[in-house]
Structure formats: structure tokens, C-alpha cells
Amino acid sequence: TQKDLGAVSRRYLSADGSRVFAAVKYPGQVAHIVSIARGDGRVTELKEVKGASGYTVTSLAYDPATATLFYTTNNNTHRNLEALDLRSGRSRMLLRAARIGDIVYNPADRSLWGLRLNNGFVMVVRIPFPYDGWQTLYVFPGDHKAFDLDLSPDGTLASMSVTAPGPKPGSPPVTQVRILRTDALAKGDTTPLHAFTMGAAVPEGFVFSQDGRYLYGSSYYTGVSNIYRYELSTETLAAVSNAAIGFFRPLPLDGSQLIVLRYAAKGFVPTLIEAQPTEDLSAISFLGEQLAAKYPEVQGWVAATPSTIPYQPRVRRSGAYRPAGELSLESLIPVVEGYKNSVGVGGSARLGDPMGYDSLGVDASYSPDHALPAKQRLHLAANFHHTRWTAGAAWNGADFYDLFGPTKRSLAGYNGYVGYNLPLIFDPPQTLDFLAKVAYYGGLDTLPGYQNVTSPSKNLFTADAGFVGLDTRASPGAVDAETGHTWSLNAHAYGAAGDLIPSLTGTFDVGLPLPLNHSSVWLRSGASVSAGAHANPLANSYLGGFGNNYVDSGGNGGAQRYRDLLSMPGFNLDALPGKSLLKLMLEWCLPPLRFEALGSPGLYVSWARPELFVGALETDLNSRASRRSAQDIGAQIDFQLLVMHRQPMMLSAGVARGFAAGGLGTTEFMLSLQVL
């Protein structure tokens, strides 16, 4: 190939021998199934692999008769099995959440074989055509782990590596390559015809040759990964390479040639070698081995196994665990908070249970500012989290980040709320949550969420219910999502003075990766419509500004707040009202800039993330008299800071220019340090 391929799956030779099929995860690009031309090394992307795994990317199998590639998605959770038709380019789902990997195609009966992991047990399964279900052939004991399944070209033999406990108690596990008859394995008989080990080294990626006479694989037997050949008829094992850096995952061709993966700095590189047995192998020396030989006493520095430590004397009590009854004080600290334009001082207490299921936070502060009414100088807030439920209450709620404006979250009066979060789909990278919240406010002077809008009523009831969906992916080394989509749909209602004003809001964002590493283009869209009279503040949404404070928290929306539906950089906060709205934003995420040594060990910058965006907004679409158009264009750059190697922070700088009739547009500058 003309470039390094990054991580690479198992590879297959096309029926005519002109191409090699594999799944790759390039540096800076999302994972794809690709076709590699053997003539010129040209790489053609065929299909994105969602939920790719680390070094193996996906489990891949090939049916040359029907030109079909079988592959797995969501490899880090409950694997799906999908099929890609190479003729049409279309992919279809075969088995969802099947948890089957190490798949291999059996040309004898068109079945797929694989290894399924469930509840800690590995089982050999067979997936007969048309691949709508599986049959369990054998379940390994819990202390056995099988991997690297393969079938001979005629389908009569199966090979796999099996890691099992050592021969003596406490001895290290041993990995053995086993060759079995498939007809016996189909009946649950796992007696091997042949078996071999490679000492303490782990054999990896052993596959059958095209004539079925040999198995080729790799192992760190000498400390460097080399290719080895096992001959079934003589049961002899021989090295066929002597690499300086390492060869991996051989693909046997006709005769004695192999396509192997050579290790390089940016990933694996396909390399052609001749498989000639050799005894000229160079071993490398390990510092740990030399240290143990020089100082034999270190060989006894072995941590005891958990089973040898008696835990019964440490049990204080037994029975059902009730998180709320286990709450205890975790922290009690002094705090400074902002309330509108005043400063309050007080304390904050945090309680939690040892397992982290429940938490309770209580904040209290006092603002000695005589410019405030006396009843607004005391600030109290409490919030409680229990599994999917949250509840809270506040009196003149204050916020630390209000000290650093321009966005203010403090509210006069009292309020209480109850929230609920139910995960409907949790299959990363795909998630779907149902969210609901009801709240009541009393003694208001401004509308919650809109600091520059006077509330038409002192007392206000709000209710929200909706869904949030996420399906985004990123390449290795990414600093942000690079492809995929997100969406949300939320129903909202205000209740005040006997009136109920409902509204409906939806968003949809879709991103596409660019050939430039770690670069993508996103189209972000949103719309909202509300009932009620246009003159009623409760019937309107209000947009404007970046929304970041000079010092801020990720809990308030993250650094990239310009992406929010109600953000509109280049305009003042809440400057653009609308009873209905339609908003589009086009965003280009540029490749990050990485710094090798910018800063000191205690505080340094690891990367910078530049972004460009342009947006357009239409409000009150169904009213000619009040319809308004606004546009903006801007840029933001985020610097990832690390403090004491452990605490990440984000320093963001942005600028935007707004355009709208009536002189509402401004040039807005933003500087924000996200500390948590």
C-alpha cells in the first residue's frame, strides 16, 4: 500500500486474486472495510464500520462465491453481525446484539462459524444459511478462553487458540493451538487431532493455508513477533521469518508466499514475504529478565491472589444494600457564589453512599450587598440524585459561575423540581434517552433560562418531556465526534395565571468526515413552534450570544456552546425572540493542532481545536409583520489544558459577527476557561 493502514482486521484474497479485503482504522479516519489493489496498492473504502474495536477493527469473513463480506459492528459492546454485498455495495443486518466474533466462512455448507461470549463463557457457535440464528456447539469452562477460530478450505477441520489454567495450582495459564474435526465439534466433541504450544508465548492469528496442509500464525516466542508454520502431517513447527520489528497476522497465498502485517509508527503495513523455514532467529533481552537473574529475591515479590486473603473478619454487616440509608458526609467546603451582580459567601456539603448510587448536595450562602432586597440576600439550594431520578429545591438560587458573567443562572424567589432520565437504547455509539422534568417557580422576576426577559408572572409551572438520540463516531486520536448524527425532540409547557402554553422543539445534526485527517463538516439544524400570543413572553424562545462565561463548567453546556439551538453568536443574549423559529448552521471542524512541549509538567497545552461556523435564523415564520432573519459567521479555538497531569481544562476563544435588520448584529468576542 501507499500508506500505513493503522489498525487492520483479518484479511482475505478476492476470488480473482487481484484485491485484498480488510477492515482498517487509519490514523485520523473512522474505520472502514476497504479493498486493496495488489497491483498498485490503491485503497478503496467500501463501508464504514460502526463501533470498531482496537487493533482488530472488526471480525471479518468472506464468501467468494457470492462476493459477500461478513463483519461485526458495535464490537466493544454486544456485537451485531452484518453482511456487505460487494456487487451492490449494500449492507444488511443479519443478527443484532448476537455477541459473536472470530467469524469464519465454511464453503462446504455456506455456514458461518464463530465464538460467542456470554456471561464470561466462550462458546463455539454455527450460523447456518440464511444467517438468521445460531446453534451452540460447545461451551468452554469459565477458566478457558478461546480465540482465533479458523476453518480449513474444505470445511473439515477447525483450529483455534485456547488459553487454560496451567498444569499446577498457581502456575501461569498456557495457550494452546488446537486442531479439531468440524463434524466432531458439531457434536460437542472437542478432542483435538493436533495441538501445540509455544512455551510461555501466546500463539496469535493462526490460519490454514490454501491447500489445508499448514497453519500460519505469529508469536513473540523470541521476544519479537515472527511468523511460524505448523505442518499438520508431521506435527512440526518452524519459523519462516526473522523480523527486526515484528510481523503479524499472515495471509497465505499460493505456494510459499505470505502477506503479513509489518509494524510501523502509524500502524500496520501489508508486506509480502517468502515462507521459508529458518533457524536463524535472534532473541531480544528483556530488562526484567536480566534484573531477575541478577537479583533473585525480586522473583518472590508477587502479590497474593484475592482468594488467599480472608475477607470475613472485615464484614461489618450483611443484608440488603439501601443507598439512601448509607449516605455519609463526603465533603464540607467554603464557597463563593454569584447572585445576579452580587457576591455571596457560604458553605457547600456533599453526601453520598459508598457505592455511588445516591448523592445529596446542599449549598448555603449569604450576599451582604445592600443593593439587594433583604429577602434576596440568603441563598439556599439542595439537590438529590437517586438512580434515574433527580429532585431539588432552591431559595434565591445562586451559582458560582455567575461571578464571571455574562450568562447569569441565578434566580430570585423559590423553586423546586423533579426530573427523570430513562435510557431506552444503550448500545454505544448509539444511545437514546427519555428525559422528563417538572418544576414550579415562585417569586420570579426573570424568566428561567432567559436572564434578560422579565417574567409575566411571579409564579410559574414548567413541564418538559422528550427524547435525545446520539450516534456519532470518531477516529483514533480524535478530539471531537467526526461523523454520525444526533437528534432531540422535546415537548414543553408553561403554566401561569391559569394559561397553559405548549411548545415543541426539535434538533438534528449530521456530520461527514473529510479526507483531511480529524476534519469533518457538520450541518446542525433546529426548529421550534409555540402556542400563545406573540406578545406573551412565555410563547417565545430567545436566542443570542455564545453563552460562555469567562470561567465556566462543562455541566453548563461545554465549551462549544455556539452549537446550541438558542445560541447565536454575534448578538446580545436573548436579543432575538421568536414564537417559531428555524435555524441552520454549517460547521467545519479543522484538524487539531498538537503541541509536543507547550507549557510545564504542571500545566501544559496538549492540543488546540479550531472551528469555523456560519448560521442562519428565521423567526416567526407564519407572520409577515414580525418575521425576522438573522445570520452570523464566526470562529472558535479550544485549547486543551492539563493541570498536574490529571485535571483537564479547556481555554476557549471565539469571535463572531451577526447580521440582522435594525442594527441588532454586533461583533462578539468570547474568552472562557472551562475548569470542570
Where are these regions (language model features)?
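Outer-membrane beta-barrel initiation region
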Residues: 1-10, 14, 24, 268-269, ...
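Short loop/turn segments that connect beta-strands within beta-propeller blades
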Residues: 37-41, 85-89, 128-132, 182-186, ...
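Solvent-exposed loop/turn segments connecting transmembrane beta-strands
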Residues: 336-345, 352-356, 364-378, 410, ...
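C-terminal outer-membrane beta-barrel translocator/porin domains of Gram-negative envelope proteins
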Residues: 395-396, 406, 419, 446-614, ...
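Transmembrane beta-strand segments that form the barrel wall of outer-membrane beta-barrel proteins
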Residues: 319-341, 345-370, 391-399, 403-405, ...
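Conserved blade-ending motifs and adjacent loop-strand segments that build the rim/top face
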Residues: 194-205, 236-254, 288-289
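Short coil/turn segments that connect the beta-strands within blades of beta-propeller domains
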Residues: 16-18, 65-67, 108-110, 154-156, ...
